[in-house]
Amino acid sequence: MTHSTRILLGVNIDHVATLRQARGTRYPDPVKAALDAEEAGADGITVHLREDRRHIQERDVLLLKDVLQTRMNFEMGVTEDMLAFAERIRPAHICLVPETRQELTTEGGLDVAGQEARIKAAVERLAKIGCEVSLFIDADERQIAASKRVGAPAIELHTGRYADAQTPTEVAEELQRVADGVAFGLAQGLVVNAGHGLHYHNVEAVAAIKGINELNIGHALVAHALFVGFKAAVAEMKALIVAAAR
């Protein structure tokens, strides 16, 4: 995984599938959303196949792998079932994430430092089939250093604490935490991505952090698309982050 010379936008389409699964219909189609996102300037498409299959389904992943013109960033938990599925479909990019059944969304970063042997085995297993692996972690030096030790070429820093911060002081502290994590990750030789909870009113400060390779954004795009359409929502976000990163 190489570091891009410009900031990239990864569009997460999970919540298009959430809307579909709410009624068990065939619409809206997350695959169509992915193709529209690509046309609007998305640099990649992110999907999370959860253990409980609450949104994205196996069929979505298989279709996306066949039709995407950019690339698929496949998010998955570190389970035997998901590792076996990944070995079957061989996505080029995989992001390992923590997962619990009761959570509304991914609530924190993967504890790499607390389970190095398990994560290292998964990274090595996926690397053998040609997958470039990133780890979704908190912006914490201990976790970043552990990610380097287990052999992951990339990390995605969890920006949820920044997104949830309420006061100006808290926002500044959490933004600095992300910036410090980016700098430490780069010093370790890692490609550094970021995401979670980012939207049109808070993304620019993160995009302006030097060294971030890609921002992965989903819920805010799907929500804004209700009013402006999906292509317009993606194009607007892409313009925001590119301008902020200059």
From Swiss-Prot:
Positions that bind 1-deoxy-D-xylulose 5-phosphate: 14-15, 50, 55, 105
Domain of life according to the entry: Bacteria
EC number assigned by the record: 2.6.99.2
Entry GO CC: cytosol
Pfam families according to UniProt: PdxJ
Pathway: Cofactor biosynthesis; pyridoxine 5'-phosphate biosynthesis; pyridoxine 5'-phosphate from D-erythrose 4-phosphate: step 5/5
Biological process annotations from GO: pyridoxine biosynthetic process
Major site of localization recorded for this protein: cytoplasm
The reaction(s) this protein catalyses: 3-amino-2-oxopropyl phosphate + 1-deoxy-D-xylulose 5-phosphate = pyridoxine 5'-phosphate + phosphate + 2 H2O + H(+)
Residues of the active site: 48 (proton acceptor), 75 (proton acceptor), 196 (proton donor)
HAMAP family linked to this entry: PdxJ (MF_00279)
Assembly description: Homooctamer; tetramer of dimers.
Record's protein name: Pyridoxine 5'-phosphate synthase
Species per Swiss-Prot/TrEMBL record: Pseudomonas syringae pv. syringae (strain B728a)
Gene name tied to this protein: pdxJ
